[in-house]
Amino acid sequence: MILLTLRDLRHRFVRFAVVTVLGAVVFTLLFVMTGLVEQFHREPVDTVDALGASTWVLPQGISGPFTAAAPFSTDAVAVVDADEFAPVIVGRAAVAQDGSEDVVLIGHEVDALGSPPIDEGRPVAAPGELVADDSLDVDIGDRVMIAGTELAVVGLTSDSTLLAGIPLVFTELTQAQDLVYDNRGVVSAVLASGEVRAIPQGTVATSAAGVADSALEPLDGAIASVDLVRVLLWIVAAVIIGAVVYLSALERLRDFAVLKAIGASNRSLLGSLALQAVLVALLAVALAAVLQLFLAPAFPLKVSVPTRAFWQLPLIAVGVALLAGLAGMRRVANSDPALAFSGASG
C-alpha cells in the first residue's frame, strides 16, 4: 500500500505540490503567530529579570510599575531592609530624534539594581546620560531629547522592551526624577535582591514574576486575538488537506474497489489515504519551517519561535490531517467491491 500511495502521489504530482505549498503558507503563518505569542510572554520576563531584582517594593493598590503610577516619598526608602536594594523611577516618555517614539524610562542609581546589562558602550555614570535598547535606532554618541532635556546616548542594551516592543531607556535616578515628576523627593519603586526583611507602611513586596505578569496584562486582548487567528489557520489547513484527500478518494474509488475485490482489507486501503494526508502535512510543515526564517525578520513585531514549536506543529499537523481525511476514508471504507466490475466509477 505504501508503494501504491507513492505512485498515486507521483501521478498527481502537480496537485499535491500545489496543496503542499498552500499548506506551507498556512503553517508558516502558524509558526509566526506562535512566535509572536511566545515573544509577548517572554518579553516582560526577560526585561524584568535584566533589572536584577527578585522583589519590587511598590505602593499598595497598583497592579505594577509599568501599568500604573503611584510614586512615594524617598524617605520611605530608608525603611527598606534587604540584602541589596535601590530606588528606581519608572515612567512613560517620548524620545525626540528625527521624529518621536514612545519609550519606558527607567531611572536608577549608578552601578545599582535597575542598571541593565550593556551590549555596547558603557552604563550610565552621571545625569545627562542615557542607555537605550537597540530597537530604538540610536547610536552611541547620539543626542536625544526627552521632556525638553537633551541626553547623550552612552550605551546600548538588547531585549529591553515591554508592551509589544516599546523600548526601554535608562538614565541616572535624579535625572529621571526631574524628567518624570520634576520632583527629587519621590520614587516609583524600590528594587530588592535577596531576603527582604522590612518594607515601608503602605507598600507591598511583589516578586519579579508578579511584576512581569502585570506588564503582560495590557496585551491579554492582543494575545486572545492572535490565538483566535491560530485556530482559524488550523481550520484552513484542515480544509486544504481534507479536500485533497477526499478528491483523491473519489478519483481512486474504482481502484479501491478492484483492490477490495481481490482481497485487500479496508485497513490497508484506509492506511494508504491516511499516509497521503500525513505526507502532505509533514512536507508542508517542513517547508514552512524554512519559510518562517525569511518571514519572521520582516514581521513588524519581534517574533521568537520557540524550539518546542518545531515538534509540536508537526504532531498537531498530522492529527489535523488524519481528522481532515476522515470523509475520504469513510467513502473508501463504504465502497462496494462490485464497482470494480461496473462500467462506471461513480
Q: Which stretches of residues belong to each language-model region?
A:
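Hydrophobic, regular-secondary-structure patches
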Residues: 20, 27-102
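Peri-transmembrane interface segments
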Residues: 36, 200-241, 248-254, 258-259, ...
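Mechanotransmission and gating elements of multispan inner-membrane complexes involved in transport
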Residues: 135-137, 145-152, 156-233
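Hydrophobic secondary-structure segments that place a key small or acidic residue at a functional site
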Residues: 88-91, 96-111, 116-178
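N-terminal Sec/SRP start-transfer signal
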Residues: 1-28, 41, 345-346
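Short helix-to-coil transition segments within interhelical loops
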Residues: 9, 258-267, 335, 344-346
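Short helix-loop junctions at transmembrane helix boundaries
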Residues: 271, 281-322, 326-339
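Alpha-helical transmembrane segments of integral membrane proteins
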Residues: 18-29, 223-243, 280-284, 288, ...
